[in-house]
Structures are given as structure tokens and as C-alpha cells.
UniProtKB/Swiss-Prot annotation:
Keywords noted in UniProt: Adaptive immunity, Cell membrane, Immunity, Membrane, Receptor
Full protein name: T cell receptor alpha joining 42
Disulfide feature: none
Organism: Homo sapiens
Coiled coil feature spans: none
One annotated GO biological process: adaptive immune response
Protein's UniProt keywords contain ATP-binding: no
Species lineage: Eukaryota, Metazoa, Chordata, Craniata, Vertebrata
Function summary: J region of the variable domain of T cell receptor (TR) alpha chain that participates in the antigen recognition. Alpha-beta T cell receptors are antigen specific receptors which are essential to the immune response and are present on the cell surface of T lymphocytes. Recognize peptide-major histocompatibility (MH) (pMH) complexes that are displayed by antigen presenting cells (APC), a prerequisite for efficient T cell adaptive immunity against pathogens.
Primary localisation category: membrane
Cellular component, GO, one term: plasma membrane
Amino acid sequence: YGGSQGNLIFGKGTKLSVKP
């Protein structure tokens, strides 16, 4: 999952820098 996408999908507000 991407950073900002992770925020929108999970709504955790955590930046997961998996995708560049």
C-alpha cells in the first residue's frame, strides 16, 4: 500500500512508504 493511500484506505494516518 502507498503512503497517502494507506491514510485514505485505513485512515490510520501512518505513512507506509511501501510504494514509491
